[in-house]
Amino acid sequence: MSAGPLQAAPKKNYGALIGAGPAVGGAAFNRTLSEVASYERSRRDHATPDYRIKIVVVGDGATGKTSLLMSYTQGQFPEDYVPTIFENYVTNIEGPRGKVIELALWDTAGQEEYSRLRPLSYGDVDIVMVCYAADNRTSLTNAEELWFPEVRHFCPHAPMMLVGLKSDLYSLDALDRLVDPTDAELVARKMGAFVHLQCSAKTRQCLEDVFNTAIHTALYDELRAPPQRGVKGMFKKKQQRDPQAQSYKRVRKHRCVVL
């Protein structure tokens, strides 16, 4: 696989990978917390990583998307809400077999007035996180009725996950006003999301699981067990000598549409 951004592969059985157990929050990746940096600046100033993964985070405004990314990349939870237009966060990860992964996280604006600018974020995306807030049932409805159609329009083949934010609120008593996780699971199935996870940026509960799952999915082929020796292994090696067999690794196929 080349050092370029990974291609979304819709035909892979992501469900099998996630359902196997270790993938969801599976083998943790060693991260280097970085300062906020633009994706392009990171590519220019730092040594070329072995892999680049781009994750775009979408959802209603004030659901906690920015807090999610800041908590993961910087270990900080912002106390004050500041509406986001566009922000990029970059963190380096030690991936499988000691490979270095550059994880580019794109934060988008959920407000309607930015709907014409938001599609610019979808280019070359590897994973899309559609987010809702545990204390906002409307945000879950919009995940299915607003964000899912938008993502599928601009990125018809990008793997998509449904992520519930502010999960720490479930520890309080006012459960009647929170999103029922069963309803969220149903929405995830309707959307065709490969997984539904909940996390808290404030307490960091399951935060690493969310991103580890996204990374495992983007690196699906790399994380699969190597072929066994024997006839099957010899056939596999023969396939790898064929340039066409390595088109996934060498050629960047742009599958997202930006109008």
Swiss-Prot record:
A lipid is attached at residue 256 (S-geranylgeranyl cysteine). Residues 257-259 form a propeptide. One of its GO terms (biological process) is small GTPase-mediated signal transduction. GTP binds at residues 59-66, 107-111, 165-168. The modification Cysteine methyl ester is found at residue 256. InterPro entries: P-loop_NTPase, Small_GTP-bd, Small_GTPase, Small_GTPase_Rho. A motif (Effector region) lies at residues 81-89. Keywords: Cell membrane, GTP-binding, Lipoprotein, Membrane, Methylation, Nucleotide-binding, Prenylation. It is a lipid-anchor. GO terms for cellular component: cellular bud neck; cytosol; incipient cellular bud site; plasma membrane. It is found in: Cell membrane. One of its GO terms (molecular function) is protein kinase binding. NCBIfam families: small_GTP (TIGR00231). Belongs to the small GTPase superfamily. Rho family. This is GTP-binding protein RHO4. It comes from Eremothecium gossypii (strain ATCC 10895 / CBS 109.51 / FGSC 9923 / NRRL Y-1056) (Yeast).
